[in-house]
Amino acid sequence: MEVGTVVQEEMKFRGSEFAVKVEMAERLLIVEISDVVTADQWRGEFGPAYIEDLTRKTGNFKQFPVFCSMLESAVHKSSDSVTLDLLTYSDLELLRNRKAGVVGRPRAQPQSPALSAKRYLILIYTVEFDRIHYPLPLPYLGKPDPAELQKEIRALRSELKTLGLRGDHKVSDQETRKLRTELALVRDEKEALAKALDRLQMVGSGSAPGARGLREAVHSLEEQLLKERAKSQRSAIKKSQEQRLLVEQLEELRASERALRIRVKSLTTELALLRRGRATPVLSDRGGLRGDGVVHRSLSRERSLTRVGIRARSGSRERIEDRGRRSEERVRRADSSGSRNCITRPSPSPTGSRVPRFDPTAYIQDRQRRQKEAELKSQRKIRRDMLASPSLMERGRSRSREPVPQLMRAGSAGRGRSVSVESRRSRCSSEGSVAEFEELAKPLNSRGRKLMSNGPAVSRGRHINKKPMCSTPAQRMRAGDTSMDTGADLSEIDARLQALQDYMRDLDTGH
């Protein structure tokens, strides 16, 4: 509120109308209230010190300019936080007692006429959780003097007459016409803006379905994006699983390749040993025993290599132990059957020889053994048929037939019969069919003695040492047959070994 500002409004307090006038003078606030009906007047003048002390006592300090601005806003009713009220002295005391917590109306005390005629203009400042009252005391001035009023009326009339003589009314008419013209322009602009607003509203209402369609399209695209993300995640998981399976299959194939290489190496070693044994004849019993020891050592090495290959091919410990156990059983049976089946025919010697007796117990045991071996053969055949891998089937076929060594004739005619060491080694390394092995591995007497394979078996260590007749035709014929059979077996081994090497080469090319 600036100096020289005068604010005047008509307000209604407790059912009565009052004219409120607030004037800002030099460092002074003047408040004047007059009753519209009775013309009673109340007037008060307040300085900055009084106003600031009053606000400090209420607990909410305000500076003098701020208080004047608050009072102006209350007169104009431009703010809801400040209002005005007009109270008498008794009403003010009642308000104070209510704030102090006194219940009931206080006793009426004798009051002076000045206090009873005094009025209090209350400036009420309302904050969020509190209301502060600033009371301004206004002493009673009484009714206005009629002479003064008439004097004021005359002054106003003269002022009006002076303004009329100066032609101010014409100027005011021009200003009125100008204002009316501006008003018409503003109305035209308003109508144009209203029409533009209507058009915009119509366009907005028409484009609403398009916007809704765009929202639906965006929503559907988001759903498709989520579906594609889920689908890509599932496909990635599936691809990773397939990759893991392929890696496992690759490891299995590499292990199978290593096992096959070990098998090829063992078969190559076996073939070399067979060829070396075929080229080296058995000269004597002592030499045969030494060769037997050497071949037994090579057989032990070959057996260890074969077992290593079996371990590499199969991941089952129980199958390895079962195969080792069956192999050892077959080796022992082959050795025992070889020693039992080597029954020599007596040569025409003048001294004569003892005829072997028929042993029924050995015959029954031999027949039971043959039955068990036939059952084992059928079980192995079923197991081989169930295997789907060609490498396993090839290994099963390569194991099922082993070469039968050729029996070599000794150089000296006076030495005793010796069983072929190569036949014993082939029995130890064979894991195929026992019945086929027995047909191929029937030992021949190097001195022309004929074995009785279908006859009764003789216990180990009861061989009759006789001087064989080297000129016997049957011996030469059997030796030729044995050479032909051994050659055929070696050819078959070579063919199978070549097929296995071709398969290994195909595996290497496939990787």
From Swiss-Prot:
<feature type="coiled-coil region">
    <location>
        <begin position="147"/>
        <end position="272"/>
    </location>
</feature>
<comment type="similarity">
    <text>Belongs to the CCDC61 family.</text>
</comment>
<keyword id="KW-0175">Coiled coil</keyword>
<feature type="region of interest" description="Disordered">
    <location>
        <begin position="447"/>
        <end position="486"/>
    </location>
</feature>
<dbReference type="GO" id="GO:0030030">
    <property type="term" value="P:cell projection organization"/>
</dbReference>
<dbReference type="GO" id="GO:0036064">
    <property type="term" value="C:ciliary basal body"/>
</dbReference>
<feature type="region of interest" description="Disordered">
    <location>
        <begin position="306"/>
        <end position="403"/>
    </location>
</feature>
<keyword id="KW-0966">Cell projection</keyword>
<dbReference type="GO" id="GO:0005815">
    <property type="term" value="C:microtubule organizing center"/>
</dbReference>
<dbReference type="GO" id="GO:0120103">
    <property type="term" value="C:centriolar subdistal appendage"/>
</dbReference>
<feature type="compositionally biased region" description="Polar residues">
    <location>
        <begin position="338"/>
        <end position="352"/>
    </location>
</feature>
<dbReference type="GO" id="GO:0042802">
    <property type="term" value="F:identical protein binding"/>
</dbReference>
<feature type="compositionally biased region" description="Basic and acidic residues">
    <location>
        <begin position="315"/>
        <end position="335"/>
    </location>
</feature>
<dbReference type="GO" id="GO:0098534">
    <property type="term" value="P:centriole assembly"/>
</dbReference>
<comment type="subunit">
    <text>Forms homodimers (via head domain).</text>
</comment>
<keyword id="KW-0963">Cytoplasm</keyword>
<feature type="region of interest" description="Head domain">
    <location>
        <begin position="1"/>
        <end position="144"/>
    </location>
</feature>
<comment type="function">
    <text>Microtubule-binding centrosomal protein required for centriole cohesion, independently of the centrosome-associated protein/CEP250 and rootletin/CROCC linker. In interphase, required for anchoring microtubule at the mother centriole subdistal appendages and for centrosome positioning. During mitosis, may be involved in spindle assembly and chromatin alignment by regulating the organization of spindle microtubules into a symmetrical structure. Plays a non-essential role in ciliogenesis.</text>
</comment>
<dbReference type="GO" id="GO:0090307">
    <property type="term" value="P:mitotic spindle assembly"/>
</dbReference>
<dbReference type="InterPro" id="IPR049733">
    <property type="entry name" value="CCDC61_N"/>
</dbReference>
<dbReference type="GO" id="GO:0005813">
    <property type="term" value="C:centrosome"/>
</dbReference>
<keyword id="KW-0206">Cytoskeleton</keyword>
<feature type="compositionally biased region" description="Basic and acidic residues">
    <location>
        <begin position="366"/>
        <end position="378"/>
    </location>
</feature>
<protein>
    <recommendedName>
        <fullName>Centrosomal protein CCDC61</fullName>
    </recommendedName>
</protein>
<dbReference type="GO" id="GO:0034451">
    <property type="term" value="C:centriolar satellite"/>
</dbReference>
<keyword id="KW-0970">Cilium biogenesis/degradation</keyword>
<dbReference type="GO" id="GO:0005737">
    <property type="term" value="C:cytoplasm"/>
</dbReference>
